[in-house]
Amino acid sequence: MPRSLKKGPFVEDHLLKKVDAQNDKKDKRVIKTWSRRSTIVPEMIGHTIAVYNGKQHVPVFVNEQMIGHKLGEFSPTRTYRGHGADKNAKGSKKK
């Protein structure tokens, strides 16, 4: 269920303050954050935000297509290594 329009998008205050401060200085340093739940807003376009995935900070470069999505969508928390190989697939078939 999406958030109500009268409330507006959720963005952590500390993250928005850091983005606004860099916009005022015209600075584009990497911003580290643990806030995966923050919504990407137009002020963040062009910034690189390092989002924590539980192990490390994954750099996410924000562009126009990401507006309205959450930061956590671009920092996967699980690694997929593929399904296990079939033991009989190597060539030793039973007859």
From Swiss-Prot:
Protein S19 forms a complex with S13 that binds strongly to the 16S ribosomal RNA. Pfam families: Ribosomal_S19. It comes from Deinococcus radiodurans (strain ATCC 13939 / DSM 20539 / JCM 16871 / CCUG 27074 / LMG 4051 / NBRC 15346 / NCIMB 9279 / VKM B-1422 / R1). One of its GO terms (cellular component) is cytoplasm. Gene3D superfamilies: 30s Ribosomal Protein S19, Chain A. GO terms for biological process: ribosomal small subunit assembly; translation. InterPro entries: Ribosomal_uS19 (IPR002222), Ribosomal_uS19_bac-type (IPR005732), Ribosomal_uS19_CS (IPR020934), Ribosomal_uS19_SF (IPR023575). GO terms for molecular function: rRNA binding; structural constituent of ribosome. Residues 73-95 are annotated as: Disordered. The keyword 4Fe-4S does not apply. Keywords: Ribonucleoprotein, Ribosomal protein, RNA-binding, rRNA-binding. This is Small ribosomal subunit protein uS19.
